[in-house]
Amino acid sequence: MAEGVFQGAIGIDLGTTYSCVATYESSVEIIANEQGNRVTPSFVAFTPQERLIGDAAKNQAALNPRNTVFDAKRLIGRRFDDESVQKDMKTWPFKVIDVDGNPVIEVQYLEETKTFSPQEISAMVLTKMKEIAEAKIGKKVEKAVITVPAYFNDAQRQATKDAGAISGLNVLRIINEPTAAAIAYGLGAGKSEKERHVLIFDLGGGTFDVSLLHIAGGVYTVKSTSGNTHLGGQDFDTNLLEHFKAEFKKKTGLDISDDARALRRLRTAAERAKRTLSSVTQTTVEVDSLFDGEDFESSLTRARFEDLNAALFKSTLEPVEQVLKDAKISKSQIDEVVLVGGSTRIPKVQKLLSDFFDGKQLEKSINPDEAVAYGAAVQGAILTGQSTSDETKDLLLLDVAPLSLGVGMQGDIFGIVVPRNTTVPTIKRRTFTTVSDNQTTVQFPVYQGERVNCKENTLLGEFDLKNIPMMPAGEPVLEAIFEVDANGILKVTAVEKSTGKSSNITISNAVGRLSSEEIEKMVNQAEEFKAADEAFAKKHEARQRLESYVASIEQTVTDPVLSSKLKRGSKSKIEAALSDALAALQIEDPSADELRKAEVGLKRVVTKAMSSR
């Protein structure tokens, strides 16, 4: 890689199933990986020798299911006892354990048991995306804009930001996926000038968002947002997988539920069938020797696929209704409905949405897999002063807080301070008081959600305001100040008005939140793993070079015509050097240096023997 640092910031769409990276240098470019693919699987695999990320990891998943990790986005920022985590664990082949209430992934790597947080796995995928960009740009990349589902809560946003830090990136901004896609749509279609209401329907591999935006004169204002952080293509695959499992059991009497390899192979076949059914109405699914020597063969119609997922498909309309209601806009006022995310290719999803909007033509002008990274790259260029076009220089993004933020009051009642769909950044205040006489400490539990009962919302963290002057109950004036930044991340301060005493948190003791020491430790570990990957690659290369050189010299020595060109008496020296080289290849775990030395030694002897007689 050439020296120098890229002055801009790359845009990364960190997806549940696939990730995508884009850069902006006078225009947006989606960058293909070394396989030539413009999206890279969000997979990390661990083997006794090395770590694989992306296509290489996904391609060996069936052979190494227990140590191939995916879906980290479904774990990030969640508690171990989260209902969705517990449900997902039943379908994942890798092991998730509870460490202090947080989910941690356990794998075998370099013949040891290792544990990784979801942030660390996500950081590995981010590092891969960063390297893909660096290979194209030819410079070191330090800054990025990373996207998250609009419906991600504070803990999930902060954990994603932490993943960026672990990967060595300076995350300039966390932006919402549908908002990023809206930029791609507005710029790509040259439609950012004309005033319009646009609904972004973003159904990906693992998450679902709907955002309603008002676009006018380069100003993108999010009016409302809704979604489900646990709905996407993976769930449609799971329903197909269950259907095929039952069919296989009915035909053969065999249950593959506990066989990770068979499940992975059948899931891959289910995913392939799902994709095929977007363009044809019937497909055949075949998996040779799926389990116990029995083959699996089945035919699947599009109608059956739609039937198996009918409830999930129908549920995608609920957030659409919600955003219209929240923005107080009727469906007839929506100018465009824009499809984003690979799962919007499913014909039934498109039909339900079009029917909801009374037969409206859906907008498919942007690439559903690439739009989010495209928008993130534009935002990265704006934040680093690299955007040069007239279209982007006046572009302004006004996003919203997806869920209400507030504090727990007496009786576990949720006191909202920042209502959902408030434009961010924002500062909101609310006053509280004491509930008993001479109370000197008040605890502020901070929640995010929409339920009246605090227990049904997400606890983000808590802190105490101490040394309140002794007064009768209800007299002290305590002000809670909520600041939400442009990343959607919250800082809370509480002030006792008569003394000015204050206490604040950036929700530091929250769910899955890493301390700066933990992040630093993970950054160092990430560097070590990268160094180990590089050392393994060098060793592999050195071994291949030596093996191929040894093979060519063996051919020379045994070929009567070629060996006749050797100096007299040198054949035995070459044979001795060959046996040294072969011995180096037999060593249990030779270093790249040892293999290189063996190659140089053999070359020296051969060169002398070949020089003019």
Curated annotation (Swiss-Prot):
Class of the enzyme per the UniProt entry, highest EC level: hydrolase
Residues annotated with N-acetylalanine modification: 2
Intracellular or extracellular location(s): Cytoplasm
Reactions catalysed: ATP + H2O = ADP + phosphate + H(+)
Stored Pfam families: HSP70
Short sequence motif named Contributes to ribosome binding, residue ranges: 428-430
Triggers of expression: Expression decreases after heat shock or during growth to stationary phase. Up-regulated upon carbon upshift and down-regulated upon amino acid limitation in an HSF1-dependent manner. Interacts with SSE1. Interacts with FES1.
Residues the entry annotates as binding ATP: 16-18, 73, 205-207, 271-278, 342
Function: Ribosome-bound, Hsp70-type chaperone that assists in the cotranslational folding of newly synthesized proteins in the cytosol. Stimulates folding by interacting with nascent chains, binding to short, largely hydrophobic sequences exposed by unfolded proteins, thereby stabilizing longer, more slowly translated, and aggregation-prone nascent polypeptides and domains that cannot fold stably until fully synthesized. The Hsp70-protein substrate interaction depends on ATP-binding and on allosteric regulation between the NBD and the SBD.
Known partners and oligomeric status: Binds to ribosomes. Binds close to the ribosomal tunnel exit via contacts with both ribosomal proteins RPL35, RPL39 and RPL19, and rRNA. Directly interacts with nascent polypeptides. This interaction is dependent on the ribosome-associated complex (RAC). Interacts with SSE1.
Protein's name according to its UniProt entry: Ribosome-associated molecular chaperone SSB2
Lineage, highest ranks first: Eukaryota, Fungi, Dikarya, Ascomycota, Saccharomycotina
Gene name linked to the record: SSB2
